[in-house]
A protein has these predicted regions:
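An N-terminally biased module of ancient metal coordination in phosphate/nucleic-acid-related enzymes
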Residues: 1-72
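A basic- and aromatic-enriched beta-loop-alpha substructure that forms the phosphate/nucleotide-
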Residues: 67-100
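Domain-core and long-helix interface of multi-subunit machines
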Residues: 3-21, 49, 88-164
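Ordered hydrophobic segments in well-structured contexts
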Residues: 37, 75-78, 121-123, 146
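Short, glycine/serine-rich, charged loops/turns that create anion-binding
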Residues: 44, 82, 127
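Glutamate identity and glutamate-enriched acidic tracts
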Residues: 31-34, 52, 57, 67, ...
């Protein structure tokens, strides 16, 4: 079984409490949990330079990503490492649109910026606040095949409930 953490924050934004990122702490975390890969998913921003640095420093696969405030909920959008420049430009559009804690982008803006959602791994806050609205999940349709919960207990509960 592979161990992954696809929700790592490394840069504080307006959506976060202030924190200090430490590469050594990240290395310790990866080693202690024996992770096989991670994704860097800061709130509404992507720091390409920092991502490249972290990728070189870690011995595991690191995916580029962004956690987007989407229609008052949150969604992780994770990319391949193939065209970082294009991903960076798209993420900068999100950053320009979200200037305060109450700002978010619409589904239409998400499509306008990232065009082909099937190129990305999309992970909505499902049973975790701020969760994505059912209407937004329906719009995302087949592009969603997993969700994020806050605990192992909630994950196990979701596995046993057929309507989730």
């Amino acid at each position: 079984m592979k161990k992954v953490d696809l929700h790592i924050h490394t840069v504080p934004s307006i959506s976060d409490r202030d924190f200090f990122f430490s590469l050594n702490s990240l290395k310790d975390y990866v080693e202690k949990l024996e992770l096989d890969c991670i994704a860097i998913t800061n709130h509404n921003l992507f720091d390409k330079t920092q991502f490249e640095y972290i990728s070189k420093e870690l011995s595991i696969k690191v995916f580029p990503g962004i956690e987007i405030d989407l229609e008052a909920g949150h969604i992780l959008l994770i990319s391949e490492n193939e065209d970082l420049q294009d991903f960076d430009l798209k993420c900068k559009k999100v950053t320009r649109l979200i200037k305060s804690k109450s700002d978010y982008i619409t589904y239409e803006q998400l499509i306008e910026i990232f065009t082909s959602l099937s190129k990305y791994l999309l992970i909505p806050h499902y049973d975790k606040k701020p969760n994505i609205k059912v209407e937004t999940l329906e719009k995302l349709g087949d592009n969603i095949f997993c969700g994020e919960v806050t605990s192992i207990r909630k994950f196990k509960a979701c596995l046993t409930e057929s309507d989730k």
